[in-house]
Amino acid sequence: SDNISFSEALLKLTDAEIDFKDDRARKINVQISSFPYQKTINDFDFNYQPQINKSAIEDLCSLRFMETKSNVVFMGTPGVGKTHLAISIGIEAATQRLSTYFINFSTLMAKIKKAIAEKREETIIKHYLKYSLLIIDEIGYLPIDKETSYVFFQLIAARYEKRSTILTTNQPFSKWGDVFGDNVIASAIIDRLVHHCEIIKISGLSYRLKGRNIFDNDEN
C-alpha cells in the first residue's frame, strides 16, 4: 500500500525540516564569511593555468589541512587566480559550517592601525583569532609601518598551530621585509606561516587579460 502511517509522515516531515534548516545554516555561514564573490573550484580554468596541480587544489578543498592547523599561501603576479582559489577553499569551509572570514590585507591593516590608536590591540587579535579559517588577500600591494606589522605578527603567532590561515600575495618572501617595513618582523611572520604550510606558486598569465592582446598597436 502507498499509505504511510502518521508517525512515518511526521518523521519524513521532520527530516525535511532538518535538511532545510541545515541548508539554510550553510548558506548563512557562507554569507557572513564576507567573500567578495562566490566562486568554487569548478569555476576555475585549470587549462588556462596548466602549471597548477589540480589534485593539490582539490586536496586543499577537502580541508584536510585544517585538521592539522596548517596554512596555505598562494603566491604569484596579479590576476593569475590566487584570490579565486582562496575563495574556493573558503566557501568549502563555510559550507561545512566552519567559521570562516575573508578580508583584504589593506583593510585588515587599517583596522589594526585603528585598534593601535585606540589601544585595543588585544581585542582585535582575539577577534581574528576566533575564526577556524582566516583568508587574508593581497599581501604586498602597500607597505605598512613597523608598529602595525608587529600587531599583525602577533595575530599570526596567536593562530600558529591553533587555526588555519590562507594568504595570497604578489610578492616573494624575499620582498616581505619591504612590505612589513622590518626584516626581523617579516622573518618571524614567514617562520610561523610556513612551518606547516602548502605554498602554491602561480606564474601564468593574468585572467583579466585572457583573450586580449594589450600589446597590439591600436591605430585609429
What would you call each of these model-derived segments?
Residues 90-103:
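Post-Walker A helix-loop "phosphate-sensing" segment adjacent to the P-loop in P-loop NTPases
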